[in-house]
């Protein structure tokens, strides 16, 4: 893609998200979503091939349907209340349908089917944008209307998302699909705590974005897209491969890594609100995520896939890829747990 055109498209994507995050007017929210959607399609098709086109088409149809539902209920709420303000009380039925539309945009279960397919069909860099930046705008609207959301609806979606995020990733060998199912599970954790502590949802989103960004950057550095290719990288870049394995454990929420912080605090907050079954179900289903991450770690670190190469060690050439941002990102993705006592300010 032509660099000036790419810069313009990225600025449009960023502008659309910023409009959604900063506005309190429903019409501007819809405009921001549409700007973001129309600008992200060329990024998804950056590598022009049939799979990328199919993925971009699936993404466009899903997001367009969600935007249509959202706009329809914005108008119905306007007729009911006579105002466009996001923070005002919503009509209960409008709140349910708006939550459903935003869940479609986020990829929450049972509207999650597009996430793995779209992520698998696009490049790693496009998948990184899809699974991180594209989550900010819908979550910001859910954050603003969290006081009017139907609790039964959002808690059901969150439990289903964590379950499907765990089950879906069990039989995957494609790293992009594994990250997609991980994203579905993390979105479930964020929406579970949204009604009780919206600030904690922002903390969870921040840590998730840092961990996912670091993991994708390491995948792109190693040019790996499958578990088989990941297992072949230990003799080329042993340090990077080791970091990927630690990051996988952090994404799974294994203590004492950074990914354990949001899960720990969410379970604690839900327990304070006298919800016993909810954190129990979340903790049990989170083991599914940890299991497929540990299995991926095992196949990568302790086994080797069959190879036709008669040489045991591949040549190690000097690395020419710049890694300026990786060291601080790796530290933040793995070593934030000692800072957890400082998070008491969220209370």
UniProtKB/Swiss-Prot annotation:
InterPro entries: Complex_I_Subunit_2, NADH_DH_su2_C, NADH_UbQ_OxRdtase_chain2, ND/Mrp_TM
Cellular compartment(s): Mitochondrion inner membrane
GO cellular component, one term: respiratory chain complex I
EC number: 7.1.1.2
UniProt keyword Translocase present: yes
Catalytic reaction annotation: a ubiquinone + NADH + 5 H(+)(in) = a ubiquinol + NAD(+) + 4 H(+)(out)
GO MF term (any one): NADH dehydrogenase (ubiquinone) activity
Quaternary structure and partners: Core subunit of respiratory chain NADH dehydrogenase (Complex I) which is composed of 45 different subunits. Interacts with TMEM242.
PANTHER family noted in UniProt: NADH-UBIQUINONE OXIDOREDUCTASE CHAIN 2
UniProt protein name: NADH-ubiquinone oxidoreductase chain 2
Organism: Felis catus (Cat)
